[in-house]
Amino acid sequence: MKDHDVLFRSIRGIAYISVGPLILLTSSLWFTDDKTAYIMAHLAQIYFSVLLFFLCGSIWSFRDYDNCHYKTRITVISLIPLAAAVTGAFFSIFINPAWGILLMLVFTFGIRHLKIINSMISLFDDSYNNLFDKISIILCICLVLILTYWVNPYTYPLEIYN
């Protein structure tokens, strides 16, 4: 087995294991009572923000490699998840959680279409690009489910924030 295969398998395993609790929290929103779901929705958003902070740190650590040409690009790319988590938390605290989740959803979905990110992702193999696409889709689905919980017209959990 080549070193590349082992590296990809370990990165893929880490990615799926780290997204697993978010999937569990998101799906449990719809199977619990309203008071518990309210807490789980906040926990899911906090966990997603923690994932973004870890992503920021992981990308930031790539700056120390020898290639100085990509150092500024990697710095800019590493600040995007940090900005998404901080502004999402700001909107959730000062407006309501639906706006924070919506902002993080737009960041997560829109990130893939930025030119600076596409130019960096094209440097990797197709297997990494496919993994990035799959994890992005999973995260977007989780965020859509959390957003759907917050704007549910039957239980209307946002009435606390009015």
Regions found by a protein language model. Name each.
Residues 145-162:
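Juxtamembrane boundary at the C-terminal end of a transmembrane helix
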Residues 91-110:
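Transmembrane helix-loop-helix
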Residues 50-55, 104-117:
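Alpha-helical transmembrane segments and their membrane-interface exit regions
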Residues 12-15, 69-79, 102-103, 127-135:
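Cytoplasmic-side transmembrane-helix entry/capping segments in multi-pass membrane proteins
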Residues 61-91:
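Helix-adjacent hinge/juxtasegments
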Residues 9-30, 137-143, 147:
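The first (N-terminal) embedded transmembrane alpha-helix
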Residues 1-2, 42-64, 162:
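Hydrophobic, membrane-facing alpha-helical anchors
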Residues 116-141:
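Interfacial loop-to-transmembrane junctions
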